[in-house]
Amino acid sequence: MYKRQAEKLVASNLWIDIGWPVTVEALSRLNYDSYTIDLQHSLIDRGTLTSLLQALSLGDGAPMVRLSQNDPAEIAFVLDAGAYGVICPTVETAAQCRDFVANCLYPPKGIRSWGPVRGLLYGGADYFQAYAGEILKIALIETARGVDNLDEIAATPGLDMIYLGPNDLGISYGASPSYTPNHPSVTEAIDRVSEAARRHSIVAGMHTASPEVARLAAERGFAFLSLGYAAKIMLAAAGKLHEEVFGHSRTKQ
């Protein structure tokens, strides 16, 4: 992930909302640049999370987690379980962002407590010096208030990425949820996130759900693109296969 950032390449991400380790293990063979296990909007619990992180170890993609909330105990758990990156939902102020980043880092830069458990398995003796400092800290901007405070949030020391969530952002502006950014305030926010990331020398990321939106985001300067939810992508692929063979789809709408 850091190598792609240094080379100014766009990194791919697949959103994991499936709690079955064997399925996630198979998806890891696709070798996306990264995978995000979703704890906010899925049925994945803590026990399952550890199994999914182990399953992702089969591939080369960086294992990441979206938190259910900005909670110190949950941040500590996902990092100790082996997450390489953490996405904090609904970051609306610089103070919230500072607290989030501090909980991801060991002293003197942060307040994370020592006890990495699985971290020692993949990082070994160098975990404290090398791996822990490379944890990706990502602030999810998904409300109008977050956009209003975007510049202060992006300036947070230690933050690696600001990530745009178009669905909830659209709702906060009074629109219906949509991965296609067509509300004027959402399209404006896309440019504002990209510009803020560039000003503060961090990465701009975005959740997309179609090749068209992904290409649009890349053209706007976004260097980290989530290409959709695993369950939805698998459903679409299986439905398309049935339609190609039998000439019709049986997918329930």
Model-derived features with residue positions:
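Expand to "…catalyze enediolate/carbanion chemistry for C-C bond making/breaking, isomerization
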Residues: 3-253
